[in-house]
Amino acid sequence: MKKIIIKFLFILVCVPALIFSQQQRLMYEKLIEKKGIMYSTGKKPYTGRVFDNYRMKGRKLTGEFRNGKKHGNWTYWKENGKTDREESYFEGNKNGNWVYYNDNGIKERVEKYEKGKDT
């Protein structure tokens, strides 16, 4: 019984680690747009995380695509390292709060969207 519990705990810990380590991460500039859908290589729309950096100055953006469309939370930074804006998408449509920041990184305004429409 003790061996079964140990094996179960081992599987419980290792399987999620393997699954999450397989998630793709790609530089945004490597993607190709065709008719509003993003592709990395091949014929299948890209699914996975993307990022981009300013040349020698840190992060520019992070986000995620699902089936070639923006999905989930996206964050953009200014060259000075301060947050520029935060966006949220669901299957390519604007969804949730979009937060904009000024040059000092202070929240300037919030726009709310649901299924691509301003609310």
Can you annotate each of these PLM segments?
Residues 1-24:
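Bacterial Sec-dependent N-terminal signal peptides
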